[in-house]
UniProtKB/Swiss-Prot annotation:
Pathway of action: Amino-acid biosynthesis; L-lysine biosynthesis via DAP pathway; LL-2,6-diaminopimelate from (S)-tetrahydrodipicolinate (acetylase route): step 1/3
An annotated GO BP: diaminopimelate biosynthetic process
Protein family membership: Belongs to the transferase hexapeptide repeat family. DapH subfamily.
Name this polypeptide is given: 2,3,4,5-tetrahydropyridine-2,6-dicarboxylate N-acetyltransferase
Highest taxon in the source lineage: Bacteria
Reaction(s) the record says it catalyses: (S)-2,3,4,5-tetrahydrodipicolinate + acetyl-CoA + H2O = L-2-acetamido-6-oxoheptanedioate + CoA
HAMAP family: DapH
UniProt enzyme class: transferase
InterPro entries recorded: DapH (IPR019873), DapH_N (IPR013710), Hexapep (IPR001451), Hexapep_transf_CS (IPR018357), Trans_hexapeptide_repeat (IPR050179), Trimer_LpxA-like_sf (IPR011004)
Function: Catalyzes the transfer of an acetyl group from acetyl-CoA to tetrahydrodipicolinate.
Gene from which the chain derives: dapH
EC number, UniProt record: 2.3.1.89
Protein's organism: Shouchella clausii (strain KSM-K16) (Alkalihalobacillus clausii)
Amino acid sequence: MKMMDANEIIEFISKSEKKTPVKVYIKGQLDNLSFGEGVQSFINGNTGVVFGEWSEIEAVLNENAALIEDTVVENDRRYSAIPLLDLKGVEARIEPGAIIRDQVEIGKGAVIMMGASINIGAVIGEGTMIDMNAVLGGRATVGKNCHVGAGAVLAGVIEPPSASPVIIEDGVVIGANAVILEGVRVGAGAVVAAGAIVTEDVPANTVVAGTPARVIKEIDEKTKGKTEIKLELRRLNEDQ
């Protein structure tokens, strides 16, 4: 897995065309309406749906107002610089309501739950679960077979570009509503307790808790039993 450099992300955002895509349901005398090459139109008789940039569609609607009986416009962004990730080729389980931006890497067998937000440049390893409403900021990197609990936040680092991103090594379990601040590395096999605020690196195979988080013990068999990663939850259809 390759992490994007902060300057690469900044350049990507800077040079991207800022878009306001819309979906418009339209009713009226539509036979001779032309929305141009940049707009997809699906018109049948006096009703139809068009997809495209709002400025282009709005111009056609205004020019042909006398022919149009009614419209409904669906719009969820304005001058957006980063599209959402095309999920069709991702070999992972991604549930409805997850927001995943372009230029995110997701490993095979990962699980992204409802409401998770994953920003540009983030990397998610094979078999890792990102639970409900968790947030992975820009360039946050999570290794293989981890669990990032519901509502947890891995701080993002794009600006300033010199700052170090959050790195979560393999086999880490992060409890619900924990916060991992910029530049922190969590060592392999570690456990971050629910609600912890992690401001410093976490040694491998330790448990940290509190605000700010401190090491409270080494990983033992009891802890392993409580934080076991279940591979059954990560199987895709072809793995069954």
